[in-house]
Structure formats: C-alpha cells, structure tokens
C-alpha cells in the first residue's frame, strides 16, 4: 500500500469528503460519517477536515482506493505519527 499517496488525501479534502458516506482518521482510528465533521481548517490549497473525535487533520475518505480498515489506519498512524 502506498501510505504516502493515501496521506495526500488528508489535505484540502472538503469537496471530496462532502461526497463520501464514510471517512476515517488515521490518528485516532475512528471510522465515521463525514457529516460528523464540524471543523475545517483553511490553507492555500483549500479546506481540510479536522477530526471531531481527536482534533487532528488526519481524515481520509472511502473513495481514495485504499481500505477503510483498522489495520490500514494503524499502518498509516505508524507511518505518520
């Protein structure tokens, strides 16, 4: 799995996440509906989701072609934290 490629989807992801049914946080490992996201951070590239459970900007959506599983999230967490 390409954890670097998957990580790229955690930035400026508002338009993508608004179309998703599920997303996940690779910091706290929660899998949830993007409708639960209450905070977005703006930067030069767009709006980035902030996890409602842990406050980190480590959210990726289900359509990125990587599995939304606890195992994948744990490996993402190990790579980036």
Where are the language model's segments positioned?
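N-terminal first-folded block
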Residues: 2-20
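Short metal-coordination and nucleic-acid-contact micro-motifs, chiefly zinc-binding Cys/His arrays
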Residues: 18-23, 44-47
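Short cysteine-rich clusters marking metal-coordination/redox-active sites
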Residues: 25-28, 51-54
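RING/U-box catalytic core of ubiquitin/SUMO E3 ligases
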Residues: 26-34, 42-43
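Short, non-ligating residues that shape and space the ligands of small metal-coordination modules
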Residues: 34-38, 60-61
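Short linker/helix segments within small regulatory modules
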Residues: 38-48, 65-68
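Short metal-binding segments enriched for Cys and/or His
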Residues: 56-69
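N-terminal, charge-rich interaction modules
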Residues: 71-81
